[in-house]
């Protein structure tokens, strides 16, 4: 009887053990998956010898396709520094940086989320909405929305966009909505600038046409050909697009920056080892002053505001 009871107890214990294993297995698997995710990029690079970098082909000077040298730009150069740091961290004799074109910043963010690329190196604004899907490095550049137009644009429209106060004469006492009524605003499709523009037009009750364009080149063409009155976009990118236009002498980018946004590099959420390496690499460039030479290559000599931005965003060791 005792033996039978012992067998019964063993059977019961085995059943309980199997039940516990069944209950705990998903938890163990989840923990293992999370642990792997935190190191997924470095593990992938160590296994394959490849770091996959997404870049925009039309976001000069941040990232663009050069006819002879391939992908170039400020963000691309930063990502190459990060690739060098990955190589050193993993003690690999060589790694290959695979450059993957993306159509827009949101496409790049989605590619990071899906694991198609390891790092998005473009002109990506770090927003809360995007942080639902990806993580971001420390800021790499201070940016914001700017406006490009023809130099012969209506004077009052230009003055308002430049932020000048209204003159006191009664003839200038027109509302914002009236001055911009039936104007055509071009903006890059599916961008943070498009969202900002649509919200602004609605807020100020402006009756205007918003025309999304595929890229900055198409937007500049719409201004040159008078199909649009104003092109809104990242101010730094607008400056580059205007300078490259064959009608550059007819174009201007207003001094005003309508928003203050930090650009950053997008990477996978939960990938803390890789994010630490990225932030440490960037902080090293900022703290050492090496960033000044890299900045100069794409934007000209950095002013005190730019240098202060890098000093403020460098993380201490």
PLM feature segments, named:
Residues 17-32:
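Bacterial N-terminal signal peptides
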Residues 39-123, 128, 132, 167, ...:
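Extracytoplasmic small-molecule ligand-binding "clamshell" domains
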Residues 40-42, 92-103, 124-126, 132-189:
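A conserved helix-loop-strand patch within extracytoplasmic ligand-binding domains
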Residues 55-59, 101-105, 115-127, 150-151, ...:
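Beta->alpha turn/N-cap motifs
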Residues 57, 140-156, 235, 242-282, ...:
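Periplasmic-binding protein-like
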Residues 76-86, 150-174, 180-184, 191, ...:
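Extended ligand-binding regions for polar small-molecule ligands
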Residues 87-101, 181-182, 201-214, 227, ...:
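A local structural motif
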Residues 106, 121-133, 196-203, 217, ...:
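A ligand-binding cleft/hinge motif common to bilobed small-molecule-binding domains
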